[in-house]
């Protein structure tokens, strides 16, 4: 299934500018997985395996990449689900967290990809501001660019990942060629967390 991530363009190699502003020789967009039912199920099962080690009451998806995964996980695990907007709405109820109430509950925060940790830190702040506690953050891919360390340092919350980019890269190595493999490995080596 790992190779399917490349086949469908969920993992791409080239020159990319990330939302964090960083330049990268690879790009991971797990939204592509949503259109591939078997791969989507495989990804969900990997999330479930990681979540099985956490004690939590509610699942909170990070907008927008974490929302579909959090939705399915909430359904499958029979846990209330909600999601965190980037910022509170300027209309209606003005809420930043939609869906499940987190007050007095332990939340598992779910996102697809972690780079700098900025989006996850925003979600953690929102959960706490709404009276909840964060049991942990679960991502499919930690790009290995110090995001997990930033979350731990700034919020005291541990990030659990299905894959770290170096692990994913090792599994993809036979499918992407040595030159791409080395290029990404060299890029990742600049981050010392």
Curated annotation (Swiss-Prot):
Keywords: Glycosyltransferase, Magnesium, Pyrimidine biosynthesis, Transferase. It holds the Pfam family Pribosyltran. GO terms for molecular function: magnesium ion binding; orotate phosphoribosyltransferase activity. It comes from the Archaea. Signal peptide: none annotated. Orotate binds at residues 115, 143. Catalyzes the transfer of a ribosyl phosphate group from 5-phosphoribose 1-diphosphate to orotate, leading to the formation of orotidine monophosphate (OMP). Homodimer. Belongs to the purine/pyrimidine phosphoribosyltransferase family. PyrE subfamily. This is Orotate phosphoribosyltransferase. It comes from Pyrobaculum aerophilum (strain ATCC 51768 / DSM 7523 / JCM 9630 / CIP 104966 / NBRC 100827 / IM2). The gene is pyrE.
